[in-house]
Regions:
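Ferredoxin-reductase
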Residues: 2-81, 86
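FNR/FR-type flavoprotein reductase catalytic core
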Residues: 69-211
Length: 211
């Protein structure tokens, strides 16, 4: 697997970090993913790109899993270290990003916001809203990067616990909205059903499951 140099390893919360590396010369489309690992470990994991697809580097939003085979090793790398990066792969991409008539709703949980951060950075002129389900305030990763009003988070821990399904049940979604879902499987199943019941056609729904 090709190796690239680590440029930065930025801690975002207690368990989540942003890994910045050199990028391959391949054409990359926002929403695609890469297999990433530590050389010599024999294991890697698929991560969605977090950065602008046109940037001179790659960024990955990674949650460190206790006892995991890949994320703890990546959490320990430092600038100058090599990491294995293979890709890009995947088709979880915007089909017509130049169509200014479209409204997008990006719904995600945890680090599932990664492809949507990439969409927003790569296509700054699209009209979008992000609905981000997190546990705590410190998991609102780089929320200040989005235009005012474009980012909404719901916290499952705290004084008034809420999840994205609760939010959607109390807010109307225009059936013409193009909706992308990224996160855990149960969230995607539940949200898909809510949106279909609200009249959003299946052709307007795109999903990516984060394991």
């Amino acid at each position: 697997m090709p190796t690239f140099k680590v440029l930065e390893n930025r801690q975002l919360s207690e368990h989540t970090f942003c890994l910045k590396t050199e990028r391959p010369s391949d054409t990359i489309v926002a929403g695609q993913c890469f297999n990433v690992g530590v050389p010599g470990s024999g294991v890697n994991r698929e991560y969605s790109m977090y950065s602008d697809a046109n940037a001179p580097h790659l960024e990955f939003l990674i949650r460190q899993v206790e006892g995991g085979t890949v994320s703890p090793a990546l959490a320990a790398v430092e600038p100058g270290d090599p990491v294995e990066v293979d890709g890009p792969y995947g088709e979880f991409t915007l089909k017509t990003p130049d169509d200014s008539s479209l409204n997008y709703l990006f719904i995600c949980t945890g680090t599932g916001i990664a492809p949507f951060h990439s969409f927003a950075a790569t296509y700054p002129d699209i009209r979008y809203q992000i609905l981000h389900g997190v546990r705590r305030d410190d998991e609102q990763y780089d929320a200040a990067h989005y235009p005012a009003g474009a980012y909404t988070s719901v916290l499952s821990q705290g004084a008034k616990p809420q999840c994205v399904t609760d939010y959607l049940k109390s807010h109307t979604v225009d059936p013409d909205t193009i909706v992308y879902l990224c996160g855990n499987r149960s969230m995607i199943i539940d949200v898909f059903a809510i949106l279909r019941d609200a009249g959003v056609p299946g052709d307007n729904l795109f999903t990516e499951v984060f394991l």
